[in-house]
């Protein structure tokens, strides 16, 4: 009120009253408009409200629904409204000169749209301080006009109207900016306006800050054809300067979207963005993220960063989440209606006015449930389901899915040695999450020795090194390789298993981390899709437990990967300290990866970050004291990776001590005791024997490191079995045991494969170590010679087959003069000799007193022999009385010569059944049947062996005995011992030279 004194106000009122009665109708109308203009122009805010009510929108060139302003005020409270009322873009009174910008006809005409070559937006902001000065000047001029009218009696209205004429340029501040430019507008009162120029597709907008980021306030279109849209990668517009890459003009319609098959695909995108030498896991995660984006948003987007491109388009109808939301519209509306009804009943029945906090909670619950379940419709009266603000798509899903990688990457980069530390700021914003998976791939490759070549090249070609220290020989070979090489050479599978235990555990834990992360992402997606079902349950106390359980599961799946990464970092840190001491790592960025060099560098050129041990011992930032340097130099990993450097440094230090010191008055023994090298070669007691001290100390350090590594491996192996349950208990969620592969399962499977390979190798060594003789030499000769056999003078044919063996000698049992007994029948045949027993020199067999003539026909040695039993033709006389001597003699089975056997090479002979003392005929028949079954089984095994070997199962050089032949021989011996077969084995064979 100090700027508007009471006298001035009285003067204004009197002037209006005096002129109100004397002006014409036209003056009356002009006076009314002037009063409204004056009242609406007292401040920038009131002027903005007046422009909004009486004219078209002055803050933007693009008309928006009025309800949009209310929604934007919720997203950006105070800031949006303050900027909205002061911003001027569509005002022809301002933008008509060089200071504000000369736009004939106004900024918003088609001819005055923004030039894509120079995307500069002109706008102005009202300033209350300048407005007060302008209004004070108008008041002073009006007072002078009234005073003049009083003194002269003239009409003051024209002068007053001139004093209050439009002077917008006096209290508006002009601004201009291109996308990315920002600044502050200072004015009286609060808040200070923050503005930023942004580009939204084919629009350039002035924005301010809000909860969701930059909130556009006023916008202006760019000229057509718009070249910077998502079609820029393929659209062939007239002006080639507008296209980023003129050579890239594909015609495939699928190229309309960046994640289509016409592009590089998810694997290539992740591979090109990765900065590790060996890429393993990041393509898998990228493909999973793209699949989730397509499933939840639209098939036309690959990332949640592109939500704004399709949030109001029909393409969202392909989204599973959108379809479920549409189906839940009526149900969520019913929940909200019931909530409003219950709240109204509560107010009516309470009998008193509830506190304001209860009203606020009521409104916030309504907004929360609508925003996160089905979305807020930002266009009143528009029934389109696409034009909505969706909290799950725009906020919840990006936060949860990005949070999985963000939280885990914080822990992954906390390694004390600096190994595999990737900064996500060095990545593009859309793929910054790959830093976590690059760190995982880098560590797995480092512990498995997959990056030996990369590190070796960096050591030689990319870093400034001192060749006096033999740095060119250093490489990052993991210690287990030095144990694996002799284990493989010696064939000791126990050493191989011990050497591979740690890399297998690393692989199993890394695989579990990838598996757990993917399962958590899928679980979050499933729970998120069900958000329209669970979020409305927050309204009522009876169903709120379901909502809280839903939220707990979401948070649990967000945190579980971080717990797994913490376990991995702990395991890796203990391993690093055990094998590498306090060694610190440095990194070098290579602009051409090794893979690209191998491929000729045609496909892509990506940056690769290589890590190697920092051997600059004077670097106090990483090695603050001498203990840290000695801890690294004496570590097992450093000595194995840098053997020549270790020997060279030790020799150099020892020689420098000797050369740099001169003997003085001190005794010789004390003088020599000062040198580490000389004192180190003195023999001293070791653990089991006398050894040089230096050698003993090194061996002791190596053994202690191995023991600690084994102990660490044991602890981590047992803890990994409970890792899933531990992560679930930490986050109060569901364990991933049943959906993710446990680390122990992978470890046990790999160790089982090693055990199987070891057993196979051991069995092969045992077979190879057995001795034997070669095949029998084939005899030559030809005809048959008859030999007299037995008392009866019956001849036995002995036929020498070509390339063959000795003819079998067959004896048949005869009865003695007093007791019925059976004499052994000896068969010395090629089939029996080759199948059952190893070849041996032939022994003569004495025939029994009584024998029958057996005819044996043979073919070529390659023809299989079939042993046929003709014992069925022989019959026993079964009687209840003991058999007489004559019956026993006649009961002896006779071997008959089959006419077909002579022409087919069939060997016919018979077996004796076991003689029984039991006179009962039924029991005799049963026992004979059992004996016959056993005999058939043995003969079948022989026939298979003979047929398989073509008449002879040949032995390998070195005397290898087949397992099947050994089994057949064992079965035959059991039958002989049991009396089923009374034939004695003849292992003899003739060898003709």
Swiss-Prot record:
* Feature: compositional bias, Low complexity: 805-829
- Keywords assigned: Cell membrane, Membrane, Signal, Transmembrane, Transmembrane helix
Comp. bias (Pro residues): 838-850
Provenance organism: Rickettsia conorii (strain ATCC VR-613 / Malish 7)
Question: Which family does this protein fall into?
Answer: Belongs to the TrbL/VirB6 family.
* Cellular compartment(s): Cell membrane
Where do the segments described as Disordered lie?
A: 779-904
| Gene Ontology annotations of biological process type | protein secretion by the type IV secretion system
Record-level GO cellular component terms: plasma membrane
Protein name, as recorded? Uncharacterized protein RC0142
Instruction: Locate the compositionally biased regions of type Basic and acidic residues.
Output: 866-879
Coiled coil stretches, renumbered: none
| Bilayer-spanning residue ranges | 331-351, 359-379, 392-412, 494-514, 521-541, 554-574, 699-719
Question: Hey, what's the signal peptide range on this chain?
Answer: 1-28
Q: Which InterPro entries match?
A: Conjugal_tfr_TrbL/VirB6
One matching Pfam family, short form? TrbL
Mode of membrane association: Multi-pass membrane protein
């Amino acid at each position: 009120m100090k700027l508007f004194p009471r006298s001035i106000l009285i003067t204004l009122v009197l002037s209006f009253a005096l002129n109100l009665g004397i002006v014409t109708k036209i003056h009356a109308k002009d006076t009314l408009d002037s009063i409204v203009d004056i009242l609406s122009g007292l401040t920038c805010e009131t002027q903005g409200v007046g422009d909004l009510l009486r004219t078209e929108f002055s803050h933007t060139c693009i008309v928006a629904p009025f309800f949009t302003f209310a929604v934007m005020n919720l997203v950006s409270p105070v800031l949006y409204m303050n900027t909205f009322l002061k911003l001027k873009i569509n005002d022809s009174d301002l933008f008509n000169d060089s200071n504000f910008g000369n736009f004939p006809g106004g900024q918003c005409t088609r001819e005055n749209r923004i030039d894509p070559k120079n995307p500069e937006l002109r706008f102005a902001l009202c300033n209350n301080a300048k407005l007060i000065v302008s209004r004070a000047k108008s008041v002073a001029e009006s007072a002078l006009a009234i005073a003049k009218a009083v003194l002269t009696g003239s009409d003051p209205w024209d002068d007053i109207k001139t004093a209050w004429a439009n002077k917008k340029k006096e209290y508006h501040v002009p601004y201009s900016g291109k996308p990315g430019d920002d600044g502050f507008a200072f004015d009286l009162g609060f808040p200070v306006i923050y503005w930023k120029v942004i580009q939204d597709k084919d629009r350039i907008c002035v924005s301010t800050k809000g909860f969701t980021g930059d909130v556009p306030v006023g916008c202006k279109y760019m000229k057509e054809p718009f070249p910077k849209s998502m079609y820029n990668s393929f659209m062939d517009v007239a002006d080639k300067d507008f296209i980023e890459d003129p050579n890239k003009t594909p015609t495939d319609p699928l190229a309309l979207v960046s994640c289509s098959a016409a592009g590089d695909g998810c694997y290539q995108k992740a591979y090109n963005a990765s900065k590790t030498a060996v890429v393993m896991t990041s393509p898998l995660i990228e493909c999973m993220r793209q699949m989730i984006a397509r499933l939840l948003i639209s098939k036309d987007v690959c990332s949640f960063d592109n939500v704004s491109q399709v949030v109001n388009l029909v393409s969202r109808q392909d989204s599973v989440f959108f379809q479920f939301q549409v189906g839940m519209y009526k149900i969520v509306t019913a929940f909200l209606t019931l909530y409003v009804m219950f709240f109204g009943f509560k107010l009516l029945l309470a009998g008193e006015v509830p506190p304001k906090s209860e009203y606020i909670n009521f409104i916030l619950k309504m907004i929360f449930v609508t925003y996160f379940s089905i979305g807020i419709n930002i266009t009143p009266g528009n029934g389109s389901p696409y034009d909505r603000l969706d909290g799950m798509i725009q906020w919840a899903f990006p936060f949860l899915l990005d949070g999985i990688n963000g939280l885990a990457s914080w822990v992954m980069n906390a390694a004390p040695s600096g190994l595999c530390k990737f900064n996500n700021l060095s990545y593009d914003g859309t793929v910054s999450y790959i830093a976590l998976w690059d760190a995982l791939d880098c560590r797995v490759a480092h512990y498995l020795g997959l990056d030996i070549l990369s590190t070796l090249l960096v050591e030689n070609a990319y870093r400034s090194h001192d060749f006096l220290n033999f740095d060119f020989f250093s490489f990052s070979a993991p210690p287990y390789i030095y144990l694996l090489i002799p284990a493989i050479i010696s064939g000791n599978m126990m050493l191989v298993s011990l050497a591979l235990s740690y890399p297998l555990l690393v692989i199993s834990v890394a695989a579990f981390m990838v598996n757990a992360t993917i399962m958590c992402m899928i679980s979050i997606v499933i729970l998120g899709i069900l958000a329209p079902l669970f979020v409305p349950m927050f309204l009522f106390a009876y169903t709120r437990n379901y909502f809280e359980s839903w939220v707990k599961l979401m948070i649990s799946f967000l945190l579980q990967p971080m717990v797994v990464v913490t376990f991995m970092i702990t395991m890796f840190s203990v391993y690093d300290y055990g094998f590498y001491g306090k060694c610190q790592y440095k990194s070098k960025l290579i602009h051409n990866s090794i893979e690209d060099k191998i491929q000729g560098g045609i496909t892509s050129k990506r940056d690769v970050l290589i890590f190697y041990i920092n051997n600059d011992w004077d670097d106090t930032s990483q090695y603050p004291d001498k203990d840290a340097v000695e801890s690294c130099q004496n570590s097992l990993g450093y000595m194995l990776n840098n053997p020549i450097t270790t020997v060279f440094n030790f020799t150099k230090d020892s020689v420098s001590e000797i050369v740099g010191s001169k003997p003085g008055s001190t005794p010789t023994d004390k003088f020599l005791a000062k040198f580490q090298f000389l004192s180190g070669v003195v023999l001293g007691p070791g653990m089991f024997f006398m050894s040089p001290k230096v050698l003993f100390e090194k061996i002791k350090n190596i053994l202690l490191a191995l023991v600690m590594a084994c102990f660490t491996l044991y602890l981590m192996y047992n803890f990994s079995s409970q890792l899933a349950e531990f992560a679930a208990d930490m986050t109060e969620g569901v364990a991933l045991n049943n959906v993710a592969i446990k680390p122990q399962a992978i470890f046990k499977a790999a160790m089982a494969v090693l055990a199987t390979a070891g057993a196979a190798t051991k069995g092969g060594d045992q077979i190879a170590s057995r001795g034997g003789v070669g095949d029998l030499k084939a005899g030559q000769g030809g005809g048959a010679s008859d030999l007299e056999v037995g008392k009866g003078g019956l001849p036995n044919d002995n036929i020498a087959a070509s390339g063959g063996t000795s003819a079998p000698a067959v004896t048949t049992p005869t009865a003695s003069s007093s007791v019925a007994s059976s004499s052994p029948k000896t068969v010395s045949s090629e089939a029996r000799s080759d199948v059952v027993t190893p070849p041996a020199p032939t022994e003569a067999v004495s025939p029994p007193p009584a024998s029958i003539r057996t005819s044996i026909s043979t073919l070529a040695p390659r023809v299989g022999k079939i042993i046929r039993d003709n014992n069925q033709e022989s019959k026993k006389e079964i009687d209840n009385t003991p058999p007489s001597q004559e019956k026993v003699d006649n009961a002896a089975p006779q071997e008959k010569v089959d006419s077909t056997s002579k022409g087919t090479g069939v060997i016919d002979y018979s077996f004796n059944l076991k003689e029984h003392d039991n006179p009962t005929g039924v029991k005799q028949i049963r026992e004979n049947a059992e004996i016959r079954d056993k005999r058939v089984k043995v003969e079948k095994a022989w026939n298979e062996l003979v047929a398989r070997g073509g008449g002879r199962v040949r032995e390998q050089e070195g005397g290898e005995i087949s397992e099947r032949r050994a089994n057949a021989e064992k079965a035959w011996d059991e039958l002989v011992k049991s009396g089923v077969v009374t034939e004695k084995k003849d292992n003899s064979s003739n060898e003709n030279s």
